[in-house]
Amino acid sequence: MMEAQTFWAERGHAYYYQSDWFWNELKERLATDKNVLGLVTGHTGRGKTCWAIKVARRMDETFGPDNIVFDYNQFRNAMETSHEYAWIVWDEPNKGLSHRDWFLDINKAITTYLQTFRFRHKNVLFALPKASLIDKSARVVCLF
């Protein structure tokens, strides 16, 4: 079986290629005193949150359930209590960051925070079905 995989991979027909490019990009960004904000998008029930958690766990060995948030209050608490260079996964950030609620004070507070908190060295992954569901001000500061 391995011979067949090698045969097709050498000809550019592999189903997927494994590369450390993504991990190297994240590590390089962190090494240059930057943080990571990322949107994890895809159809509902397809594993966006699980993937985000796996990324966070690989990047931060201390990542745990307290770093998974579902609303603004949990997000604020996680940001205040987590260590430097912590990773936070915000599942379905519709509450507080919805593109339809751009005029609400809570939305303004969160987007301003996301635009200015790099010095705290916190990293956030947002899991949601479409990037357009999150406020534009938050989208533009996301790395991916």
Regions found by a protein language model. Give the residues of each.
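N-terminal pre-Walker A segment at the start of P-loop NTPase domains
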Residues: 1-33
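Hydrophobic anchor at the beta1->P-loop junction of P-loop NTPases
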Residues: 38-42
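The conserved Walker
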Residues: 43-45, 102
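Conserved lysine of the Walker
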Residues: 48
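Hydrophobic positions on the alpha1 helix immediately C-terminal to the Walker A/P-loop
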Residues: 51
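Walker A/P-loop NTP-binding motif
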Residues: 54-61
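Conserved nucleotide-sensing/catalytic segment adjacent to the nucleotide-binding pocket
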Residues: 65-126
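A short helix-turn-beta junction within AAA+ P-loop NTPase domains corresponding to the substrate/partner-engaging
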Residues: 136-144
